[in-house]
Amino acid sequence: MATDSGEPASTEDSEKPDGVSFENRAARAVAPLTVEARIKEKYSTFSASGENIERKRFFRKSVEMTEDDKVAESSRRDERKAATNISRVDKVPTNVLRGGQEVKYEQCSKATSESSKDCFKEKTEKEMEEEAEMKAVATSPSGRFLKFDIELGRGAFKTVYKGLDTETWVEVAWCELQDRKLTKAEQQRFKEEAEMLKGLQHPNIVRFYDSWESTLKGKKCIVLVTELMTSGTLKTYLKRFKVMKPKVLRSWCRQILKGLQFLHTRTPPIIHRDLKCDNIFITGPTGSVKIGDLGLATLMRTSFAKSVIGTPEFMAPEMYEEHYDESVDVYAFGMCMLEMATSEYPYSECQNAAQIYRKVTSGIKPASFNKVTDPEVKEIIEGCIRQNKSERLSIKDLLNHAFFAEDTGLRVELAEEDDCSNSSLALRLWVEDPKKLKGKHKDNEAIEFSFNLEADTPEEVAYEMVKSGFFHESDSKAVAKSIRDRVTLIKKIREKKPAGCLEERRDSQCKYVRNVLPQQQTATLQPTPGPHTAAEYEETEVDQHVRQQFLQGKPQQQSSSVRGDTSSEPTAGPVLHSDTSSHPTVAYSSNQTTSSQEQPKLTQSPVLPVVQGQSSVMPIYAAGVGVVSQSQISPLTIQKVSQIKPVSQPIGAEQQATLQNPDFVRSLNQDVTSVKENTNNPDTPSGNGKQDRNKQRRASCPRPEKGTKFQLTVLQVSVSGDNMVECQLETHNNKMVTFKFDVDGDAPEDIADYMVEDNFVLENEKEKFVEELRAIVGQAQEILHVHSAVEKSIGVDSVALESNSNQTGSSEQVLINSASTQTSNESAPQSSPVGRWRFCINQTIKNREAQSPPSLQPSMAMVPGLHPFPSSRNTSNQAISQNTVFTIENNPGHRELFTSKLDHKDVVDGKIGEHASIETEQSSISYQVEDDRQIMTPATDNSNYSAALVCPVPGECEALTSQAGMFMPTYPNQQAAVLADVHIAYPGESVPIGGNAALTSVLVSSDQKPQSLSVQQPTIDAEFISKEGETTVNTETSSPKAVIATQTPGFEPAVILPATILESDGERPPKMEFADNRIKTLDEKLRNLLYQEHSISSICPESQKDTQSIDSPFSSSAEDILSYSMPEVIAISHCGIQDSPAQSPNFQQTGSKILSNVAASQPAHISVFKKDLNVITSVPSELCLHEMSPDASLPGDPEAYPAAVSSDGTIHLQTGGGYFGLSFTCPSLKNPISRKSWTRKLKSWAYRLRQSTSFFKRSKVRQVETEDKRSAIASDPIPLTREFSSDTRALSRCKAMSGSFQRGRFQVITVPQQQPVKMMSFGKDHRPPFNKTTVQSSEQALTFAEAAVSQLIEVEPAMPTHKASVSSRKLRTLYETFKEDKGDPEQGDIVSYSTACETSVSSVATEKNVTSTTEVSVQSGSEPLDKEKNESTPGKQTCTNEFSATLAGNRKSVTKTRPEGDQYLPLREEQAYAQTQNSLFYSPSSPMSSDNESEIEDEDLKVELQRLREKHIQEVVSLQTQQNKELQELYERLRATKDNKAQSSEVPLSPASPRRPRSFKSKLRSRPQSMTHSDNLVVKDALGVESNTVSCQQSPASKKGMFTDDLHKLVDDWTRETVGHFPSKPSLNQLKQSQQKSEAENWNKSCESTPSTMGYTSNWISSLSQIRGAAPTSLPQGLPLPSFHGPLASYGMPHVCQYNAVGAAGYPVQWVGISGPAQQSVVLPTQSGGLFQPGMNLQSFPAPPVQNPASIPPGPK
């Protein structure tokens, strides 16, 4: 159509013989000339004389004119024109010159006489010809267009002449097509297309004016009139200039794409079908590019329908089959771009079309493709010329690609992960290139703002920014465009992932938490650009850039291998983005891997916690998978996480590194990282992955994933001897498939065949899948090799540690076995139909966390037992050296997680790497801090940690407590929190295996040589503190905490389970041996009784995973729970309760408590801290921050706020995550595969509820509320508001970030200040004091906490009514007793509370729903308790204040603002409560969910619950056995109470409903039956669990023999009763009355302890509930609570509490008498007063008589 006048339309033109008419040649020769010049030339060329000359010349057969001759002739003609009377002689010489014939000259001279005649005749002819040329030779039917006899070009089927539009007097191209002999149908079709083409007007489309049929020389032809392009085609340009500059290529390609997009967006879409450089025209003056020859393809194809008419080189394979769509134009564009990039014709190596056809249809790319130098251009071309049209990029994708993006100098990114459901987005706008803006702007500032997808428009927001003075008015369009592009991309992503979004959201949160740790390392990691364009597409350049900058801002977290990880992992790829964790994690991975290898358990724990943010339910496994999921989930999330994460992470990682032999760890990490990078690289080539917020590759960001659609993540590498690798595959259709294979025995090809056969992998992705599998195998082999080497080197030490702590050693072995067992058993359940590789399919693939647990399991790293280096870890932990041990101790959970998780996760997600790095970093930090800490409270710290890790073995516990204490005090809160979280997450899971083994070893070490351990641990702790402190006073929130806390949720069970939880939780096979044989026997009995598949139970993480995988909802739930757990852990860590316990002189007690704490750590600690310290309030917030992002440690970081919200959001998670939580929990329940699977699911529920709570907590409103409360309490460190909305969240984050300020709706953040520096300094400054302060009180607190927990456990069932009161009273009584024994009840209470809470939490973890509830409750309730406690007892308050002050300078605000804390606490707790309730209601794991109820009611569920409770009991026994007389006394006290109220306490124990914790929250919130109740439930449950655990622990402590015997008896009776029947639920009033009575009785005894008790009540109660057994954590809302009569048994957990927690939402009068704040405290269900009124605490609620622990149905749990 539009044809370049000087360029042949096709190759045929150039092939024409010389005999072509002169006119044509001349016309072509002047092609480049302007139209005017051409016209003049035309005249001269076709002048009459010229024609004569030509005629004569041809007539005389003169030699062909040369170019010079032609020019001469032309000039002669001009002269002739000028002088009409030119003698004929003048012409003769010319002729002679031309022809070289003298004869002619002679003849001419002879005819001189006739010259005048000839001249006249010539003149006439010349004029006639000129006139003819000037005349139109043809006219259009309408008369508008004229045709001149000036040929501009000729093609195979067309000839182009010059034309004129008489309406505009603009020259046009008149194109005549040869008669195609069209059928009538084809003619009609062409007419229709021509009419359609007439209306097309676009700056990049050659204008089509008209067309009609005509007759030329007796033949029919079709005439097309189009715009005339004067500067030739792209082909001529390439020929002329050979090389095209990148800038020109980008600009012209963008214009071509815009033209194609215009065509493809018509209705119906217009397909060019013959796009090639010959049909792309250039307009010289403007440099614009236009697509031409529209319609020609149609005409050519219509007549040659069966013969290929087109350009084979540019024809897509499907064009040959006549079945094609718009993608053929994308293919042709790719070939055009290839030609432009190489100046070489595609397939020029082929001799004919047949060869091209063969290559095209076989998918062989042109030889010139390899000549493309620019990788980005090459990537784009590759995405365009794929053989499968469905895999090609779309025009929109290409235009959104960063390469074609028009650089405005601005970058807009998500300030926090997108949950795909909230209409309000938190965005951050960066100025990348101030030079491109007309106004002045600081390039180091980021403007954070909220954007409502429904209400806001980019223009309005840009205008507001201009009004606010951020931008010049002239830049508003650029700002609006940047915002619009980002919002459009977000919308697109949401549309593409409607189903996976929710899960993704959850994952994002989990990832967020997890990333808090990895992010620091991620900072380094993220900068690494990644090849994943697809992964990047989710995250805009800005996002990537921001993340990158943010991460870079936190170099301490550098993870050199992160990028590698990101790149190699396809699934994780999006996680660096895709791996945000992934990439950051990769760096982590290096450190982490080392740590994990050296100290598998501890390393694993840390990783898990990080992952936990993703899914508490699958603490260990979830971490791995969760990481992937998270990465994947949301670039936004990752970005946030990474942002928040960095501060905390460096500390954690550094500490870990320090703890371990840094060099050794580094080498291990590097190895693992390398492996992971390789594995992860495919997934995260771009480093940005989709979720990597870093702006790894702007070009790829916007583009959807071009590469493999699947994502393969390594979850675990089993080093137990079976060489099994557990991988997680996110399929193309959003399914999560977890499978295990033998590194040596299974061939990747076989696995790939199976995957393809089951449609898990597309046929075209098979090759890539095999490659990635091979890379994973190689990495796994490396890991195994390193592991074996490490094991050998550490063997002696490990043995020693194991000897020191039977539990430690056996635990590790158990863990390993567990890993193996889990791999096989859980795998089997999960494996579903997938055959030998045990695939676990999770339909809700987006929720990677759900799959994470299963996958994590195999990777022992996540779960101590599963950890690839579990045994090695055991050995490693011991052999590695105390440094290593310390590292483990410091980050028991973290390290453990890191190790196994790293192995797999790094590979898989790169997140593990991140975690690993963090862990390593933590180690280093710990080492440094260790020295300081050592001085401060070496033994205490060790003890703290130790206890948490290896409570079962007194020595071990002490040692570990000592070491851990060191680690924990400074970072102890975080560490403890992590441990607690781990424990809680999986009371009986393999958590104990990994974390415990390492911790146990450390503990043993500490116990044996308290000083050295103490020293080491203090060093670790000190370093940790140092780093943490540096990171933030709120170290809890800070990196260490973030690291531990974040990781802990997932890893929590691992850490706690190691000693205490292992024993107490029959659900999971205690990986570690119990301190005493009786306990072990009891444990076995419990396992057999409660969990026939006890080992599986122990392996609960995997089982949960399997179950979760099976049940997609559960997977989600697990994920949520994990998130929940994380926040809680963080909160606890922040609170520093763990520190206290660690410090407690009684290491055994501390250990038990710590384990308890670890289990209930987050909820309990939060509760305790909240009670004892305003810090607690701050803690949740910090937890949230961590979970949200590194900013958690840094108040200023906007992401930190989301994290804070998350931690507080634990509840929120439950609320929003209730849905997810249910999802996760349900899989277990639904999965009839095994009860332990159900238990795992329950735990997953709890975790997911926690996480979902966190997640939901982040829900704008609730989160904001929580954040505000926490902010008030914790001031800066706690940006509590998720509820406010993205705005608030973003603002909070911004506020948190130092150097940030708010202007209207916008928050300006100084980029460099994004790191949580404040938090660091805070944590550092105050943490040591806290550690010191809590050292003594820690013991007391732990002891008291246990006693209180036991009471609480008993009371908890009454929590709604009786449970709460009983728990409160018992707790108080315990506290008083403990106080009396200890002498420093206040601090001791705090510590013990946190310990108890932790223990409860671990129980809760077992009961997933309960756990989340409990944790939430504890978090929110803890503060109220803390306040209440302070208020009620001045002395206690003082201690509490001291504790909070020392605990967290970062929480200074909280401590200082105790009243504020009280206020906020109620609010936060209320929020948490509401959220928890919501979570319970909505989440599958939610105790309120009807699904849950049904499943809970199942016999299997009951048995499972019983197992969980028994396991908790065992754990308690183990811990208690190791605890000192104080615990024993407490136990006796509890036992007496139990005897007095055996039934009531037992009943409470069984159900320890999550609602109880929610009740806690409810008090704060005063929400009677809303989702809030659900939230409270979750919290309550966690608390309840803690109480239960503590109670059990205390009992054995007081009377080992008796306790064990009692436990056995209790287990038997409990099993009998529980299994036998479900007692009817007492009415709320009854429960309340009972609780009130109990509380009244206990109030006097433990008035001081009340605040803390209250804080822990929920958690403890939940724990007790679980221990008690029968009642499931999450009971159906409608399920009536059993009426409890009689005194609470020591094991009796306030069943009411549990049910209440569950029933909070269910019962309109959830907490009768409890007003919003009061409701929150599980213990104070009856309270109508403030959150936790000192007077009203537990005592105010009489403990409900507990009929029987057995009487409470476990099903609801």
UniProtKB/Swiss-Prot annotation:
Residues 1555-1566 have a biased composition (Basic residues). Keywords: ATP-binding, Cytoplasm, Kinase, Nucleotide-binding, Phosphoprotein, Serine/threonine-protein kinase, Transferase, Ubl conjugation. Residues 536-546 are annotated as: Interaction with KLHL3. PROSITE patterns: PROTEIN_KINASE_DOM, PROTEIN_KINASE_ST. Coiled coil: none annotated. Activated in response to hyperosmotic stress: cell shrinkage promotes formation of a membraneless compartment that concentrates WNK3 with its substrates, OXSR1/OSR1 and STK39/SPAK. Activation requires autophosphorylation of Ser-307 and, to a lower extent, Ser-303. Autophosphorylation and subsequent activation is inhibited by increases in intracellular ionic strength: Cl(-) potently inhibits WNK3 kinase activity via direct binding. Also inhibited by K(+) ions. Kinase activity is inhibited by WNK4. Its EC number is 2.7.11.1. It is found in: Cytoplasm. The keyword Transferase applies. Residues 551-570, 578-604, 674-689, 1404-1422, 1641-1650 have a biased composition (Polar residues). The modification Phosphothreonine is found at T540. GO terms for biological process: cell volume homeostasis; cellular hyperosmotic response; maintenance of blood-brain barrier; membraneless organelle assembly; monoatomic ion homeostasis; negative regulation of apoptotic process; negative regulation of pancreatic juice secretion; negative regulation of protein localization to plasma membrane. The active site is at D293. It comes from the Eukaryota. InterPro entries: CCTL2_WNK, Kinase-like_dom_sf, Kinase_OSR1/WNK_CCT, Prot_kinase_dom, Ser/Thr_kinase_AS, WNK_Ser-Thr_kinase. Serine/threonine-protein kinase component of the WNK3-SPAK/OSR1 kinase cascade, which plays an important role in the regulation of electrolyte homeostasis and regulatory volume increase in response to hyperosmotic stress. WNK3 mediates regulatory volume increase in response to hyperosmotic stress by acting as a molecular crowding sensor, which senses cell shrinkage and mediates formation of a membraneless compartment by undergoing liquid-liquid phase separation. Interacts with WNK1 and WNK4. Disordered regions undergo liquid-liquid phase separation (LLPS) for the formation of a cytoplasmic membraneless compartment that concentrates WNK1 with its substrates, OXSR1/OSR1 and STK39/SPAK. PANTHER family: SERINE/THREONINE-PROTEIN KINASE WNK WITH NO LYSINE -RELATED. This is Serine/threonine-protein kinase WNK3. It comes from Mus musculus. The gene is Wnk3.
